[in-house]
Amino acid sequence: MLDINLLRKDLEGVVARLETRKSPQPFLDVERFTALEAERKAIQTRTEELQARRNSLSKQIGQLKAKGEDTAAVMAEVGGIGDGLKASAERLEVIQSELNALLMALPNLPQAGVPVGADEHANVEVRRWGQPRALDFAPKDHVDLGAPLGLDFETGAKLSGARFSFLRGPVARLHRALAQFMLDVQTQEHGYTECYTPYIVNREVLEGTGQLPKFEADMFWVTRGGDDDEATTQYLISTSEISLTNSVREQVLAADQLPIKLTAHSPCFRSEAGSAGRDTRGMIRQHQFDKVEMVQITTAEQSDAALEAMVGHAEAVLQKLELPYRVITLCTGDMGFGAAKTYDLEVWLPAQNTYREISSCSNCEAFQARRMQTRYKTAQGKNELVHTLNGSGLAVGRALVAVLENGQNADGSITIPAALRPYLGGLERLVA
């Protein structure tokens, strides 16, 4: 959530920065915001006047009583002022609620230096690593490579519908090995603390990280059974960023606790609303997929460097898996709702002859912290909002796709990256 004082000081500038994200979408009803602010100021001014008048009358009552004179008229006026103050307080509460709703619908402001553009075509490539392997045969995609190894979309569809998969045998083992390998890299080499988190969370948790209220259509939700008064709607997480980041909600942290670095492997559930017709074949876009997530909680001074480090932590996994990739800076129109700056890592897929996203690393600055009310105490004893960062380290299913396609041989076998072999009992190749 944005700082409302920023809008009060420079509404025109904030609106201009918001419009760079996906113009001409009107993120803020400026007319409504301005009207609410004007009414709020008028009520606050009137409240101060009434309070001053009440204080003056209270003194008069004391003086009248000391003289033995009648106080009924003055006390009646004080009572009327009390009614007016109560009505003002109630109206201010309504106004604040409406202002809060407007703020909750606003995305984060892009950092200075983020490329301005409407969509992915304006993203900027930063660097590449690795050379795509030259194949002397026509590459197969992961669907054809995975079928004899236990990658089964038919059973997934039979059980749950489109965009679900069923893994068995060698490919299921590879999937598990990848997740364990990623966790080990992040915990043993980069200092993250491994966590196991709930996959079902409450509404306020999703509001804290910014998925709600704007993106409810992208979520899966469940209703807990029981009596009517016990029935509760909760949500399946779309990423463990949600639970990891909210683990510090409504806390004041000590400065020496920061940065906090957390990681978790979890399934992720997404309805993929608006993705009809996109990536309908294979594992690239699923309703349920696994991901190893990285989260950092930092001070404002630490967050820019933390983002660069986090990108490096995701890159390390790809490099150890010997997978060619590139790093992209997302433009203003392609960034996620809560991000101030985002890097995407895209892995090379031979069958598609292109790079596809496998990790997204973002600095959300104080945007989520303000929603979660998470602060830290400075050396001067002042409470300041933390900064939050999140990144994929990596998407497990897409890593499996990349290992299958980049490791394929003419006979259909898959060469396992050397770093992954200890997690597969020393196995060097997957063979049907």
Swiss-Prot record:
GO terms for cellular component: cytoplasm. It is an enzyme of class 6 (ligase). The keyword Ligase applies. Keywords: Aminoacyl-tRNA synthetase, ATP-binding, Cytoplasm, Ligase, Nucleotide-binding, Protein biosynthesis. It is found in: Cytoplasm. L-serine binds at residues 239-241, 293, 392. Pathway: Aminoacyl-tRNA biosynthesis; selenocysteinyl-tRNA(Sec) biosynthesis; L-seryl-tRNA(Sec) from L-serine and tRNA(Sec): step 1/1. Homodimer. The tRNA molecule binds across the dimer. Consists of two distinct domains, a catalytic core and a N-terminal extension that is involved in tRNA binding. Belongs to the class-II aminoacyl-tRNA synthetase family. Type-1 seryl-tRNA synthetase subfamily. This is Serine--tRNA ligase. The gene is serS.
